Amino acid sequence: MRYNEKDKLIELSVREIAFSLDKTYGEKYISRRLRAKIGQEAHTYYQNNSEGHTEYYIQFIHEISGWKAHIRGRADIVHKNENSVHIEEIKSTVSDIENVSQDITQIMQLQLYCHYFHFYEGYNNITASLIYIDPVNNKEKHVDITPNSISNILDEIINGIISQIENELLKKSVNKKRSNTIKFPYKKYHKYQKEIIENISKNVESSIITMLNAPPGIGKTMASLYPSLKFIISQNKRLFITTSKTTQQEIYLESVKNLLKKGSKFKSIRITSKQKICKTDTYDCDENDCPLFEKYFNIENNSLPEQLLKLDLIDRNSIEELSNDHSICPFELSLDTALECDIILSDYNYIFHPRIKFQRFLDTFNNSVLIIDEAHNLIDRASSYYSESISTSQITEIINFVKHSSINEEIKLKISTHLKRLINHISRLKDQVRDLEFDNEIINIDIQFFDNFQKTFDNLLIEYINDLPFKLNKKDAIIKFSDHLKFFTLLLKETNTDEFETVLDIQTNNLRILCKSASKKLTEQINKFDSVILQSATLTPTEYYQSMLGLPKNVSILSYPSPFPPKNSLYLIDNSISTTYKERKMFISNIIKLIKDVIELKQGNYLIFFPSFEFLDIFKPHLIGSSISFNILSQDRNMTDKSRAKILSKLKNNTSQILLAVMGGVFSEGVDFKGDMANGAFIIGPGLPKISFDQELKKSYFEKYYGNGFDYAYKFPGLTKVIQSAGRVFRSNTDRGFVIFMGHRFSTDSYLNYLPTDYDIKFKNIITEINRFWSHN
């Protein structure tokens, strides 16, 4: 829907009017996508075999309450002559066609078409039918619909829309006053913070993309949040804040609370993922399958979002408490409530993931500001969104699942036979394989095979669903595989571009789609927003991040040095050791000796950052066996929030602790080691990704397009993790400590030149320098 306030004109589709009678418009989950796809095929088949006019275009003006509603739509099929007209709307169904319930939205669509032909084409002899099609069993059912006068209903619907518009216009005038309540919450600005606020304020007002590169201590969270919030409220827009980790969301929540404490008037909500907040085992978010979903949309005059909106900060606890009280879907409640919020805080997935991103907000992105926190993390995350795989072992598991399922033997045989075709197809891809250094091979894929396979599997899936003696569970293996296969097939259609590669893992028969760069996909999504702010302490080199994040050349680049006193920090390089993959084991004893010598100079807590869990696991037993007097803490591969919090508590309340952690992990960014939680950090190596088949493909791609393959694939991603890890030691003006970069590569110009210039790195005797540093502080 669009409207012009000056001309008092509303642009509406027939579908929008019809669906206003039915609020169940949840996100498009798996079975809905399946039904939509099969439904489209049924539409096309029926229309192609009809003698009527297909996709018949209609438009008319409906005047009411001083407004004009311009209504447009397309009827599926229209049969007309001089005296009569017959209208048909097609609806596919996966249910028993003889007992299918009539769809109120499609009946309303038909009535609107009847209304048009009577009042605007002058027909009196009008008939209409709903055509139900069961594409699996090739059945049809025609249901005649009696044309009724809908003038009063149409008046009521459009008056409701006008009321919404007028409330929105009133809200705009109120928001201009409300924006005056948004006050900077602190007595003083951090160094450079006021300058950042002024620059971001100008940029959001001018719809300019901002790259904010600022180290810890400047207060970049508030520096971007405050001016963006003030702007979006004054302009009746919305602010999306997206992060890669929940720890970063906690930081934003604290900033939101501080703004609210100072009297700022706004509404904010944090979206918890559906997987975390869902309370049932029902597979589909559909009114027919999930009791919580069904009840949510069947509550008369649903006022639950309004109850939540009495709060200024709406979090998971408040959403779960209200949804539990009413036994309704907490995720749908959160999304509906978010529609009325000024700030929506969520994970990257809900903005950038092609399958998960918000659907109901898509039309409003162009009226929104987006803050991307720790934007350096978006590069790998986005590439993973567009990478997918399917293996013969995975398919075999599905065949075994089908074998032991409760469906009839005929359907079991059909599904199993079809899946074996896919196993055979993937196995035959080995014919393209040559002897290579890696156990992988780039191969050519028959996209048409997968497209046809998917269509057949969709039909078999509906047979499977209809034959089950119980309700589907969202953990159902066939359903999960179906969703997986759909997306895999969809991505295959994009692999004709250089950004993608199709790879066969020879030993495992794993067929993969590798996205080498998602920059073009990011460009598409970022361009949907009115203004975007990408921020991090590591957005240099600028050219690298502009390229990898899909940003235009005319972005506003804001870059600042550390605001902390230089005397409080000491940066050193130990170039006497090697941390290369081939040599690092030989230098473990040297690394441990230096660590022990350094930490004996001052009692405190220390961080050791590794390039990978692999090296951490190798190093840890040696450190324990060295009779070190400190307590050793260690990051695990699958660490829970609770375990992470426990380690942070030990560092906060104790001394003589050593934390072993991985660069790029949960302890290397998005966490503050304030005060004496961390007195120093040892960075072991430049954090380069491990050489692999995939990384080498990326390297070749970057070399072709940017002439800098090694830097883009290895060096810059590694140094980003190094700088993030080093930043954990210094979180305030009073924090004091050191960072030792361990490895000879740090002393070479190709690495040294990309470390922050304000590090003032020293190469002299490390023990002497640290001793002097502690004695002067």
Model-derived segments and spans:
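Signature of the SF2 helicase/ATPase Hel1-core->accessory helical subdomain module
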Residues: 224, 230, 250, 326-343, ...
